[in-house]
């Protein structure tokens, strides 16, 4: 793991590309950012050329040595887009439900409608990816969008995608698949609101 080779500043080439590509859509993802001589695994979201959300990965993957070269974030992130409230997370964050619940409940009057996970999750542990995405959707009564890479990395570690969209009740709007693809998925807020009104168990959730 060598962020020195790939990290950019916030005015770097990839960040500028994301800004340019967002003129008529929202574009988001994570990349290695260098800031004040520190490295962050940072999620960025752009719309109409402007940065609308920024989140630094909270949980660093110590098994792979990420904690030795990256700085952990310490701030939750929630933002709005076209009437939806969204909360972004990066990869390994998926395994830590307390952090996600803390994000969801930071404003009890406006819990996130969509949880976004961008990931570099290997094939060897893909069953955990599938199960945890469903769990995060069900326990937080939210849509969950999980976007994962595909192909082999420089160490030969295989990644088989399984990008998916999970409903608040655990059903799929987009089932996991093992190919490169562009997916068009429509999510609607009214069924989510009705579901939360009918089963308001978030009001009984533990605070953190």
Model-derived segments and their meaning:
Residues 1-13, 36-39:
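Metal-dependent catalytic neighborhoods of phosphoester/phosphodiester hydrolases
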Residues 1-3, 44, 55-61, 164, ...:
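Short beta->alpha transition motifs characteristic of CBS
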Residues 10-28, 95, 100-182:
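CN hydrolase (nitrilase-like) catalytic-core segments centered on the catalytic cysteine
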Residues 29-31, 42-45, 77-79, 146, ...:
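Short beta-strand scaffold segments in enzyme catalytic cores
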Residues 34-112, 124-131, 194-201:
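Active-site catalytic loop in hydrolytic enzyme cores
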Residues 57, 81, 168, 178, ...:
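Active-site donor-binding loop signature of nucleotide-sugar glycosyltransferases
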Residues 184-208:
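Short, basic/aromatic-enriched C-terminal tail that caps enzymatic domains
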